[in-house]
């Protein structure tokens, strides 16, 4: 049996498991429970998106791209932001594609938080903010918000 305290870094060992994982485990063992967690859509991926994926595979596009994203996708994101929001971003220098929201949040926090920096985290919030902040050596400062204030940070 592996003693994880001996092989994992202390910063990882000291991260508490998310309470939502326990909830998922409990709800998965119960009949008739409808999960409202994790933000999975309640519809299939649209056919044109699935077809584009199939076409890419058939064309042999199965290799790694640049670690910041495929050049064609980066340019399209830049064009979309210009068309929809009138914002200009340089696709080679100002856009990064990630595999999902959690990776994007992790990269952003790692890019701006230094050891010892305090990071204000309004609650309720996404479960990853606090552990990622701790992993980079930041100090989470939890601010509880209330429904009667529309969950806005107040004094």
Predicted regions and their residues:
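Conserved core of the PLP fold type I
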Residues: 61-155
